[in-house]
């Protein structure tokens, strides 16, 4: 995503495949392991499941030693798409498509704080959009 100052801002979101709701969504100036871990921490605080399977692409942030160990320490089973096969991660790709086309691309953000605040609330917004407006 582009910030109001023209620089890129990266998003990491976690969705629940059961109802397609966004459990956690976080922005950062860098697409790195810290962004992935911090997003996962938010998800773990919101949802208290005894077993969690986290499916992602093979981005360096998800394959890093720190993230793999974070998952092990929190009893999270990692699942990853095959390299170069975005269809394995279709629900997440669809989420980002909806997020960008219906919210990000039609909203004028005056500053980064506003962009981040909306992103933190995206779980509620997307759930309502998918389950009330579309259905």
For each feature predicted by the language model, list its residue ranges.
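Charged DNA-binding/catalytic regions of mobile-element recombinases
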Residues: 1-135
